[in-house]
Every structure is written in structure tokens, then in C-alpha cells.
Design a protein with these regions (language model features):
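C-terminal motif of bacterial Sec signal peptides marking the signal peptidase cleavage site
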Residues: 13-16
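Bacterial signal peptide processing site
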Residues: 18-20
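Extracytoplasmic "Venus flytrap"
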Residues: 29-48, 52, 56, 62-75, ...
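Periplasmic-binding protein-like
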Residues: 31-33, 85-92, 111-115, 155-156, ...
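Hydrophobic alpha-helical segments within soluble ligand-binding/sensing domains
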Residues: 73, 129-154, 196-198, 250-254, ...
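Hydrophobic alpha-helical
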Residues: 90-106, 173, 191-253
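Flexible loop/hinge segments that line or gate small-molecule binding clefts
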Residues: 95-136, 251-259
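Hinge/cleft segment of the Venus flytrap/periplasmic-binding protein
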Residues: 157, 161, 165, 176-177, ...
Length: 307
């Protein structure tokens, strides 16, 4: 099977080279693979990508869901190559698989654009990416906290281990608070899920941990943390004895808690901006063949109850 796949990739590469000059006038078919649409934020990107693609003429989007499985994701890439798509947009499940996937795409001469999760192990300038500066996201959380309190006990809820978003958002928080009086007592991965975050936080409280700050790598885990804290009789806020909770994404559910004052702040990364910028970059990459790196802006949203 592997031999036939490589043969087919060679044929696709030849055809792709001969047709590249005509991509601007023909219908362009783009495969878009979402890492896991059970992730609320990724589902919003999916919806916005579909909506934005309607404004583009001669563009067909084939959206696939890897369901959080790196093996499934690689199979989806292979299937899209066999279908002869003009380009692949990829939100990586595991950035450690970047090399194998990138090699497949290069062998077929099909351009690939990574979005939301940056690849690992690829040379700078040798790939295309659209997404946030993830370390800056964590820094923004910490900066917002330090404007209110310069000391206290913190915990961090981390996304899937090994992903750039989880690692760099966590590093961003740590880098900013290193010279402050804020001490990190615990950090644990809840893999973006609110139910796992709820259980983790309840266990921390049950163990007697005294928490002043919860830094969460995304809104869903922050929501789970708030649910766990409330179930344990804790109060969210900025007064003495109250807990400040920070999220990322500004999802509708997260914004509801911002408006209620239960989440102190979230970092907004606009899903429509990510979807539209990624699709535009993919089309440009198909037509021009020049690698693109674009970092998108993030914005701190603080609950109006604390302004």
C-alpha cells in the first residue's frame, strides 16, 4: 500500500507542477483538517472558515476532523493528497508529527499551511503558518493579574502536553511573574477540556491548596475551574480571599462568565480573523508558492465588574 501511495504521490506531483500556472483561473480545492472539533474554539474556527469561504469564488473547501488523533490526521492528509487537492490547511493534533506530514506534502508538491498550532522540527522559512504568538498570550494573562495583585498562590491549567499553544502560553505566564510575589503551586494538563479541569481543581481544593490565581490555557478549562471552585464554596473576584481566574479565546461561554464577573479576564483570539487570514494565506500560497508566516494580534478582555 505504501508503494502505491508513493507512486500516486509522484503522479500528483507531476500534474501539480504542470497545472500550477493555471490555479488562478480554475476552481481551487482546499483540504482543511481540524485537529479536534470537540474543542469548542476549533469548532468556532470551523464554522467561520465555512462562512468566510462562501465569499470566495472558485474555492471548494473539504473540511475534515482528526478527532484529536495524530494517526487519523496523517491518514486524512494522505487521503487529501490522493484526491489531488490544490492545498492543505492543517491544525496539528501533535506538532511532533510535523516532519512526516510535511514530507508527504512536499513529495506530492501540494502546499501545506499550518494554522493555530505551529509545527515543530521544521526549519524557519520552510513552512507557512498563521496564528498567534502564543507566549505573548500567557504574558498578557500575567500582566493583567499583576496590575491587581503582586503576590499570591497560582495554579496553571495546561492544554495538551507537547502542543506549542499549551507550552508557550504557560511559559508566558511564568516569564512574567518570575520576579513577582506570585508563586505557582501546581500545574496540570486538562487537555483543553472543562470537565477534566473541574476535577483537577476540585482535587486541588480538597487537598487543602490555597489558591489566589487560576491561569488557564483556554476558556473551557477556565470554565471547568470556576465550576470546581464554586462547588467547593469558593468565590471569584479581586477581594481578599477571592480567586482570580484567567482564560483564553473569548468564547461565548467564556464571555458569559466575564460578564458575570466570575472570570476576571480572557485573551481574545478572533476565530473569524484566524479563519479568514488562514484561508487567504492558503490561496496565496497555492497561487504564488511563497511561504508565509503571520502572527495575529491578541486582546485582553477584563470583566467590566472590575474596571
Amino acid at each position: 500500500m505504501k508503494k502505491y501511495l508513493l507512486l500516486f504521490i509522484s503522479i500528483i506531483a507531476i500534474l501539480s507542477c504542470s497545472n500550477r500556472e493555471n490555479t488562478e483561473s480554475k476552481n481551487i480545492v482546499i483540504g482543511a483538517i481540524m485537529g479536534n472539533m470537540a474543542d469548542t474554539f476549533i469548532k468556532y474556527i470551523h464554522d467561520d472558515l465555512l462562512e468566510y469561504s462562501k465569499s470566495k469564488e472558485n474555492i471548494t473547501i473539504l473540511i475534515k476532523d482528526a478527532s484529536g488523533d495524530a494517526g487519523i490526521e496523517q491518514n486524512l492528509v494522505e487521503n487529501l493528497i490522493l484526491q489531488g487537492v490544490d492545498g492543505i490547511m492543517l491544525q496539528l493534533v501533535n506538532p511532533e508529527t510535523s516532519r512526516a506530514i510535511d514530507d508527504l506534502a512536499k513529495q506530492s508538491n501540494i502546499p501545506i499551511l499550518y494554522f493555530n498550532h505551529r509545527p515543530k522540527g521544521l526549519e524557519e522559512g520552510a513552512y507557512s503558518y498563521v496564528g498567534l504568538n502564543e507566549r505573548r498570550v500567557g504574558e498578557l494573562q500575567a500582566e493583567a493579574a499583576l496590575k491587581v495583585r503582586n503576590s499570591g498562590n497560582a495554579v496553571i491549567l495546561i492544554g495538551p502536553l507537547g502542543t506549542e499553544a499549551a507550552e508557550d502560553r504557560t511559559k508566558g505566564v511564568k516569564d512574567k511573574i518570575v520576579n513577582s510575589g506570585i508563586k505557582i503551586l501546581r500545574e496540570q494538563s486538562a487537555s483543553w477540556y472543562r470537565d477534566r479541569a473541574l476535577t483537577i481543581v476540585e482535587n486541588w481544593i480538597t487537598s487543602g491548596l490555597n489558591i489566589d490565581f487560576v491561569f488557564s490555557n483556554n476558556d473551557d478549562m477556565a470554565i471547568g475551574a470556576i465550576q470546581g471552585l464554586e462547588a467547593s464554596g469558593k468565590v471569584m473576584g479581586t477581594n481578599k480571599g477571592e480567586i482570580m481566574v484567567f482564560g483564553v479565546d473569548a468564547t461565548p461561554d467564556g464571555m458569559n462568565l466575564i460578564n458575570d464577573g466570575k472570570m476576571y479576564a480572557t485573551i481574545k483570539q478572533d476565530t473569524m480573523v484566524q479563519a479568514s487570514e488562514a484561508l487567504d494565506a492558503m490561496i496565496d500560497l497555492i497561487n504564488n508558492g511563497t511561504n508565509i508566516i503571520k502572527y495575529l494580534d491578541a486582546e485582553v478582555i477584563i470583566s467590566s465588574k472590575y474596571k
